[in-house]
Amino acid sequence: MTALSNMKCEACQADAPKVTDEELAELIRMIPDWGVQVRDGVMQLERIYKFKNFKLAMAFTNKLADLAEEEFHHPGIFTEWGKVTVTWWSHSIKGLHKNDFIMAAKTDQLLV
């Protein structure tokens, strides 16, 4: 399978299918530092990134904002001193789509 970070997001409409349990099991293995959370019945991907200070956390947040704009897919971002919590899910389907896994992998690449 092509690395997730090399894939592009596709337009996700309200009738797009959520990932199946089988797809979830396969895709989550490709982004091992991410966890699955369920909030208000909505499955989401989440990872906490740690930094040495607020300025580095903010720089990462800004890189992530640029990436999100390029891909037209936007995460939940919580930036605080020394860490950034990133949450991906597809708002239109209220759950996880392959796009979320692609974006999680691309987010990890921002650290490289």
Swiss-Prot record:
Task: Kindly list any coiled-coil regions of this protein.
Answer: none
Q: Which Enzyme Commission number(s) are on file for it?
A: 4.2.1.96
The record, for Pfam families, names: Pterin_4a (PF01329)
Single GO MF annotation:
4-alpha-hydroxytetrahydrobiopterin dehydratase activity
- Which GO biological process annotations does it have? tetrahydrobiopterin biosynthetic process
Keywords, A to Z, come to: Lyase
InterPro entries tied to this protein: PCD_sf (IPR036428), Pterin-4-alpha-carb_dehyd (IPR050376), Pterin_deHydtase (IPR001533)
Q: What class of enzyme is it?
A: lyase
Q: Highest taxon of the source?
A: Bacteria
User: What catalytic activity does the UniProt entry give for this protein?
Assistant: (4aS,6R)-4a-hydroxy-L-erythro-5,6,7,8-tetrahydrobiopterin = (6R)-L-erythro-6,7-dihydrobiopterin + H2O
Q: Which protein family is it in?
A: Belongs to the pterin-4-alpha-carbinolamine dehydratase family.
In terms of HAMAP family, this protein maps to: Pterin_4_alpha (MF_00434)
> Protein name, please?
Putative pterin-4-alpha-carbinolamine dehydratase
